[in-house]
Amino acid sequence: PLMCHTPFLLPSYKSLWHSPNPPTFPPTFIHMAINRYSRLITYHGPMGVDFKPERKADIDALFNTLEGKLQVIEPLPEPPRGAIGTELGEGILRGGNMTILSMLSGTPYFLEDASWEDTLLFIEDVGEAPYKLDRMLQQFRLSGLLSRIKGLVIGTFTDCEGDDDERDYDLGYEALRYMEENRDPELLDPFVCYVTTGHGTPHQTLPLGAMINFRYISNTIIVHPYTK
């Protein structure tokens, strides 16, 4: 099975989309390779174990997304940060598990530099203490990624509270600060929004590699019908 910690599969990534039935729900390692080297859209969403009657809303949203229907994700769990206005924040959604993204940084399977400026970076994680999350954020900062992406879509960070002295750590606040740092004045102001996707419930399905819109005022994410 494809699990989160399977980097040994990456050298064979090309066989995944030359297959007559390429996987569309791979872990972050494979999400990134497929999204970088092909035009396939992959999906970050519920797994088979989540197909339960009490998860009907998640499953309905999953199949609507798979069918390419217009999706409006609302309400989002927290108010947005950053560039708040009447315009849409628009970009290509890329990313996945934050720990794995940091592992891939600097490799041929990470985001191509030329794609950074049209990217809305999605991150989520589970079981990582705040000091580890900040270390990963610093890696993205020092690489120049945060100062160039359009925005950050923060998913669910399950069991990431840390010790009592770490509970005040605010990932969204710190990320926005770094996104504004050394930013090219020709780029639009960055923003941070939040979505319930990651580990736990509810779990929205996100199409990685697709164009999405974020509406600042209504605090909603819009996934438009797409073909690739």
Question: Which stretches of residues belong to each language-model region?
Answer:
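Conserved anion/nucleotide-ligand pocket segment
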Residues: 40-102
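C-terminal active-site/capping subdomain that shapes the small-molecule cofactor and substrate pocket
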Residues: 132-228
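Conserved active-site and cofactor/substrate-binding residues in soluble primary-metabolism enzymes
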Residues: 25, 29, 53-57, 92-100, ...
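Structural motif
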Residues: 20, 40-42, 91-92, 99, ...
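Short, glycine-/small-residue-enriched flexible loop/hinge segments at domain edges that mediate gating
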Residues: 1, 121-125, 150-155
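Short, acidic/small-residue loops that bind anionic groups at enzyme active sites
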Residues: 10-34, 41-46
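Oxyanion-binding "anion nests"
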Residues: 94-134
